[in-house]
Curated annotation (Swiss-Prot):
Start and end residues of each stretch annotated as Disordered: 26-53
InterPro entries linked to this entry: Ribosomal_eL44 (IPR000552), Ribosomal_LSU_eL42 (IPR053708), Ribosomal_zn-bd (IPR011332)
GO cellular component entries: cytosolic large ribosomal subunit
Alphabetical UniProt keywords: Cytoplasm, Ribonucleoprotein, Ribosomal protein
Similarity comment: family membership: Belongs to the eukaryotic ribosomal protein eL42 family.
GO biological process: chordate embryonic development; regulation of cell cycle; translation
Function per UniProt: Component of the large ribosomal subunit. The ribosome is a large ribonucleoprotein complex responsible for the synthesis of proteins in the cell.
Gene: rpl36a
Main location: cytoplasm
Pfam families reported for this sequence: Ribosomal_L44
Subunit structure: Component of the large ribosomal subunit.
Organism field: Danio rerio (Zebrafish)
Protein name: Large ribosomal subunit protein eL42
Matching PROSITE patterns: RIBOSOMAL_L44E (PS01172)
Length: 106
């Protein structure tokens, strides 16, 4: 379980100094219908003949690398950058901090 705080003081390239940054998890955008590969694939698929390209079924990884999106909180900067961290099964953003000697409650 990886727990990351919602704010982080780190270097901002635009401000050229350390600033507080808002942390969110990166999400992939929707695929464009007009990308060259998608247009070619759709053209090939149309008409008779069934599936024309192999469907990938041999997945090797069980997790994805977590990518953090850091946004500078300076009102007239707001520059954004990505920061990749290691692979993990469970990722949490701004969860409760772990305390020493605390009894686990269920």
């Amino acid at each position: 379980m990886v727990n990351v705080p919602k704010t982080r003081r780190t270097y901002c390239k635009k401000c050229k100094k350390h600033q507080p940054h808002k942390v969110t998890q990166y999400k992939k955008g929707k695929d464009s219908l007009y990308a060259q590969g998608k247009r070619r694939y759709d053209r090939k698929q149309s008409g008779y003949g069934g599936q024309t390209k192999p469907i990938f079924r041999k997945k090797a990884k069980t997790t994805k690398k977590i990518v953090l999106r850091l946004e500078c909180v300076e009102p007239n900067c707001r520059s954004k950058r990505m920061l990749a961290i290691k692979r993990c099964k469970h990722f949490e953003l701004g969860g409760d901090k772990k305390r020493k000697g605390q009894v686990i409650q269920f």
